[in-house]
Amino acid sequence: MARMVFCEYLKKEAEGLDFQLYPGELGKRIFNSISKQAWAEWIKKQTMLVNEKKLNMMNPEHRQLLEAEMVNFLFEGKDVHIDGYVPVQTNTKA
């Protein structure tokens, strides 16, 4: 049976992560209150950030920036802003 958590990002019960993916206290918080679906959405945003801002994970400042963006996205409801990126519009004509 899947481990269920109340996901702070989705604001509902959802399948939790299988194991802690991030170190430290923040990692524990993510493991206990972020779902697999929310984590997958973050990974997409993280990839965009790393690529568009040319972040180097060997640089401590870049890692701090990425961690701050992750907290904002997962826990504070702030979307990731990437200069020049326009989300694909879905046509919802009925």
From Swiss-Prot:
InterPro entries registered for this protein in UniProt: Fe_traffick_prot_YggX, Fe_traffick_prot_YggX_sf
SUPFAM superfamilies on file: YggX-like
CC annotations in GO: cytosol
Pfam families: Iron_traffic
Superkingdom, natural source: Bacteria
GO biological process: cellular response to oxidative stress
Keyword field: Iron
A GO molecular-function annotation: iron ion binding
Keyword check for Zinc: no
Function: Could be a mediator in iron transactions between iron acquisition and iron-requiring processes, such as synthesis and/or repair of Fe-S clusters in biosynthetic enzymes.
Family note: Belongs to the Fe(2+)-trafficking protein family.
Protein name as it appears in the record: Probable Fe(2+)-trafficking protein
